[in-house]
Amino acid sequence: MKQPDHRPWKVLNSEYLAHEPWFTVRREAVELPGGARIPSYYVLEYPDWVNVIACTDDRRFLLIDQYRHGLGRTSYEIVAGVRDPQDATPLDAARRELYEETGYGGGEWKEYMVLSANPATHTNLTYTFLATG
């Protein structure tokens, strides 16, 4: 089996196409370690996100039912949101989102995982917390 090449790509050119509060899009011309070139590679810059898996004392999970324009329909979701500049930590953002979206707060909190939702094109991390009680 061939070993993957983990060397970074060389950026030949980079330009911003959109710069909004919730996301930024840039198009880059890149050269791969083997010499191949990709003339238009799109990178989406987002602030970090938080997810909250919230479970009440009576062992019920809290889900939000809301319309999502990207899907064109309503969707059941766990509590989630953007880490705002005023949030000192991802945990602060998670606590704020849980309260804003459900009215619940307090309880015990544990960082469950940190991952990148789409590391091929997104620059941010998603912090997922388990909130119980």
Language model feature labels by segment:
Residues 10, 105-112:
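A short coil-to-beta-strand element that immediately follows conserved catalytic motifs
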Residues 12-51, 57:
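Acidic, metal-coordinating catalytic segment for phosphate/diphosphate chemistry
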Residues 62-63, 77, 97-99, 110-111, ...:
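Conserved beta-strand segments that form the floor/walls of ligand-binding pockets within enzyme
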Residues 6-8, 41-47, 51-96:
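Conserved Nudix-box catalytic region and its N-terminal flanking loop in Nudix hydrolases
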Residues 26-34, 118-133:
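Active-site-adjacent beta-strand/loop module that shapes the phosphate/pyrophosphate-binding cleft
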